[in-house]
């Protein structure tokens, strides 16, 4: 499994010499195996994610603060791809995930209506992911939400990874 942190900052992206070591992008984690790709959050670091063309792709949101969604419209692969990308969050059902992103990326607050423009984004309920991805790839996708801490875990027979995000 390949794990890449494309952003780890909170609030706003920053630049300059002081940020060269850890980077200045907001939250985005990319997990790739031979079977699938899981992207957690689409902060400003999402612009650097290469979206796989040869395996299922899942984009999960830990929550919908600005620093976790602001990069969604700036990934060239997402804008060019014609294949399905599954979008979900453990916090809300699929329709509320879609509505939350539509509010942020509509024609009023953003130059284009991104969510309606990108028809290949398939919004799915988090509960359905475990069944779909376990059957197709052998991965298990689970979440345990306690208080202000969202835990999302991806697990294969030989690899386990957990993403812990304290809002």
Label for each model-derived stretch:
Residues 1-167:
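Binuclear metal-dependent hydrolase catalytic cores
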